[in-house]
Amino acid sequence: MLGLGTLARKIFGTPNDRKVKSVRSLVARINDLEPEFQALSDEGIKQKTAEFQRRVQEGGESLDDLLPEAFANCREGARRALGLRAFDVQLMGGIFLHQGNIAEMKTGEGKTLVATFPAYLNALAGKGVHVVTVNDYLAKRDAEWMGKVYAQLGLATGVVYPFQSDEEKKAAYAADITYATNNELGFDYLRDNMKASKEEMRQRGHFFAIVDEVDSILIDEARTPLIISGPSQDRSDLYTKVDKLIPELLEEHYKLDEKTRNVTFTEEGNEFLEKRLLETGLLPEGQSLYDPESTTIVHHVNQGLRAHKLFNRDQQYIVRDDEIMLIDEFTGRMMRGRRLSDGLHQAIEAKEGVSIQPENVTLASVTFQNYFRLYEKLGGMTGTAATEAEEFMEIYGLGVVEVPTNRPVARADEHDAVYRTAREKHDGIVASIKDAHERGQPILVGTTSIDKSEALSDLLKTAGIPHNVLNARQHEQEAQIVADAGKLGAVTIATNMAGRGTDIQLGGNVEMKVMQALAADPAAHPDEVRARIEAEHAEEKERVKEAGGLFVLGTERHESRRIDNQLRGRSGRQGDPGRSAFFLSLEDDLMRIFGSDRLDKVLSTLGMKEGEAIVHPWVNKSLEKAQAKVEARNFDIRKQLLKFDDVMNDQRKAIFSQRLEIMETEDLSEIAQDMRYQVIDDLIDQHMPPRSYADQWDIEGMHRAVQDKLGLDAPLAKWAQEEGVDQDVVRERLCEASDRQMTEKAEAFGPETMRSIEKQILLQTIDAKWREHLLTLEHLRSVVGFRGYAQRDPLSEYKTEAFALFESMLNSLRQDVTQKLAQVRPLSEEEQQAMMRQFLDQQRAAAAAEAPVAPAPQPAAAAPQPTPELVGAEAGEPDPAAWGNVARNDPCPCGSGLKYKHCHGRLD
């Protein structure tokens, strides 16, 4: 009997069905326009683009009104440039993306082409469109491939990748459509907000982004902060000493919670720890583990414990070239340049005996959650998003629409087979692989870690089954292994690397076969080679289809159903036959951690024999419920963390906005004056309280403060003795004196130089104060959770204190800027000559030694902004000796944004 919900869906359709139905009329209009656009010449297509741009940018026509014509033009452009005519379902996907949704499209449905439609339409507004990919290879490939379509339509394409020059990046962002990775977009946003002038900024705004593999970037990577950092003090010796203590710990000294991936010391552990730290001298005599002074060493020991108990080699990381390379748990790929924060990475380096890199100080940071919420409109594509639809809507305001496939999915998804032990499961897996291999059916075996993929490989070697292994160790051969994975009888063991972005074609990859054949015989005629290989491929593909298509075999369930669905999605592309199954055991991590006891009792009751597996829909439902609970818990964690992140994000936007305003303003003397007056007000309130008499004023303290902050030797004691002098009179006289002082400085430096000095000091001080503030907020964040024990809401406490800290930072900023401007002065003739001699000596020494030298000391006002270091990238101090002859009116090579004569070429 049908339930009421099922009956209603049969009559009215699902919400997704209604969304799909709502755009069919638009697709029909695009199809009706097809003959009109097919009749256009190549130049006519470009002219249509120019016409659309005028209608949007000058005529005020909406993009929605223009959609049918723009999509029809884009379809024709793609047909001429690539020989590909977009299917109706691809047009649907493009419409949903333009409307600010996530289009869930299965493997092989042509998502790359789909993105061109909304990208083209939105680029007509002239504000730039960003197409976001998960790695640099895909960004370059898609930009080159789809760039042909945009060129046919008369639009420019740019691609952004690491280590480009500022000019190259600026040109890429200025293009109509820009391809880039999520990492590079985020880092460029941070770098732009550390620039000295607006002209140096690369990005031109955040109008519309299309995010490929959107669930990976906005869910899996959501909490990953992008950090631009600089080096701090080297404490490698401390990490090494702490690491030697960890193996001495017994099980009763700590408590490991696998569900939350957390490890904490017990009371016995703390006592043992204090004793050993005192013995090794890491804790000073007479100091307790609970003293505030012990916070740092306790933090390092905790990180050492986490490194040993929660991070395992070949699971969470691998060791390569004297480095710890982290592995993405969702994709199984190495994450180059990614480091764990708070000293945890250094603790792992000490554990593995590799070189310990110094910790880094955060200069600027942003999470993907907050970066992508900067865009006016956002769209995304993936093969798996439905299970996270609630999170996409709540956090990003993105709806999820499942786009129908062009051909029905012919893959058979079998129920999970559950064994009692891992040994029995592995026996079942090997038997199943052997059976499929003998029938000629290609098999993709999904594992969750490197060590498990290699353990299974050993079992297959013992069984005499030829196979390939794809994991982070063999990532260089990825393209070849994936190309061969669909061949007759092929067996491929892979970590989660094969779960996303890989297109396994039945019978193998034709293009790869053609390339290999031509490489082996360069004299062969390409057309003849292609014709022969295509004929052979068609025959092999039919044989693979007869064998059942690609068999995807999962060896464990992941915490997230999405990752499992991604693995299944490798099979059954574009209507091809296929099969998927998961082989599990009660010893698997997910089963063990999330309650295999009940299932174990059921299996015992059924009287299962050795090597038997239970296969039943009930088991699947139980597992999916467990996964849904884990997903809900992870969502709650991400949602709660986002509330904390939003506090910093609001402050970041305020600071970056203020910074941009300063860069855009030519004359900052008024801002500097406002800051000066505020500092004077604060000093008077502090030393001459309201409603107090002159004999109650702290004249001595006020005199010192005025000298220190304003650089003025004001006769405050004399003023205080005058009749009728109150706080307002003192304020007015100090303001006048400070204004006279700054006017004299401007005359001494020259107006242009003074404006440049004010801008540089303001920007440098903002950056320095923001760095300190980030560190303070990190410390507050790490301890505020304990307020919950006192029945106080940690989030409310964090908001209140973070706001107070922000106000304190702004106050400190005003004081520092005022003080620096008061101290800056032109150099005397003797100082100028001494500096020039030192500079020339350095140049001669550098030329003789052919080695870089540190730049000469400079006055505060003329010092260049330090170059931030990105973790994993090399950045050094600017070296004037290597610049050669620089014209005095040219931009300074240090990158400060000033002319050379006002920066490193200053004679004063």
UniProtKB/Swiss-Prot annotation:
Record CDD domains: DEXDc_SecA, SF2_C_secA
Ranges where the record places region Disordered: 846-884
Signal peptide stretch: none
Family annotation (Pfam families): P-loop_SecA, SEC-C, SecA_DEAD, SecA_PP_bind, SecA_SW
Top-level taxon: Bacteria
Record localization: Cell inner membrane; Cytoplasm
Gene behind the chain: secA
Subunit structure: Monomer and homodimer. Part of the essential Sec protein translocation apparatus which comprises SecA, SecYEG and auxiliary proteins SecDF-YajC and YidC.
Native source organism of the sequence: Cereibacter sphaeroides (strain ATCC 17023 / DSM 158 / JCM 6121 / CCUG 31486 / LMG 2827 / NBRC 12203 / NCIMB 8253 / ATH 2.4.1.)
Keywords, in A-Z order: ATP-binding, Cell inner membrane, Cell membrane, Cytoplasm, Membrane, Metal-binding, Nucleotide-binding, Protein transport, Translocase, Translocation, Transport, Zinc
GO CC term, one of those recorded: plasma membrane
Task performed by this protein: Part of the Sec protein translocase complex. Interacts with the SecYEG preprotein conducting channel. Has a central role in coupling the hydrolysis of ATP to the transfer of proteins into and across the cell membrane, serving both as a receptor for the preprotein-SecB complex and as an ATP-driven molecular motor driving the stepwise translocation of polypeptide chains across the membrane.
Residues that bind Zn(2+): 892, 894, 903-904
Gene3D superfamilies listed in its UniProt record: Helical scaffold and wing domains of SecA, P-loop containing nucleotide triphosphate hydrolases, SecA, preprotein cross-linking domain
Record-linked PROSITE patterns: SECA, SECA_MOTOR_DEAD
One function term, GO molecular function aspect: metal ion binding
High-level lineage: Bacteria, Pseudomonadati, Pseudomonadota, Alphaproteobacteria, Rhodobacterales
Bias (Low complexity) ranges: 846-864
Bilayer topology annotation: Peripheral membrane protein
E.C. designation(s): 7.4.2.8
Official protein name in the record: Protein translocase subunit SecA
